[in-house]
């Protein structure tokens, strides 16, 4: 299967998401899948996107590059608000659309509140985990406990 492992994001749990997603991606590969990790917020360049499912890159190196981007999250959020670029990084939605399934390795806001799941459902993208309504209700319920 061609699997996108979605990681990173903008929450304070970004680093945990990257760690989790790295381990998941490595495990999926050991089990014969074409899996690759991508940062939902920063995405990847066009040249990398072309070979995304056939490139058996070093997952740990990719994760390290994602961790280095962590210092830029706040600045990038501000820049995107001004430019209207939106949340998803370059090539993220295109690659998720081409995947057989997306593994949701996101933690914290956006990954657990149903927003990304809702976008995926609108686009017909298959993903792991609960649907957007269940995610949203769960997030709201935890806030009141």
Regions found by a protein language model. Name each.
Residues 1-143:
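ATP-binding N-terminal substructure of ATP-dependent carboxylate-amine bond-forming enzymes
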């Amino acid at each position: 299967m061609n699997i996108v492992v979605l990681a990173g994001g903008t929450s304070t749990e970004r680093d945990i998401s990257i760690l989790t997603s790295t381990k998941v991606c490595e495990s999926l590969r050991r089990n014969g899948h074409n899996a690759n990790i991508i940062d939902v917020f920063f995405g990847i360049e066009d040249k990398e996107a072309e070979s995304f499912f056939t490139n058996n890159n070093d997952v740990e190196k990719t994760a390290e590059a994602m961790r280095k981007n962590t210092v830029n999250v706040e600045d990038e959020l501000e820049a995107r608000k001004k430019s209207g670029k939106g949340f998803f990084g370059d090539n993220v939605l295109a690659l998720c659309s081409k995947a057989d399934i997306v593994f949701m390795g996101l933690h914290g806001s956006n990954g657990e509140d149903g927003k990304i799941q809702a976008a995926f459902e609108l686009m017909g993208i298959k993903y792991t985990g609960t649907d957007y309504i269940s995610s949203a209700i769960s997030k709201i319920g935890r806030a009141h406990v």
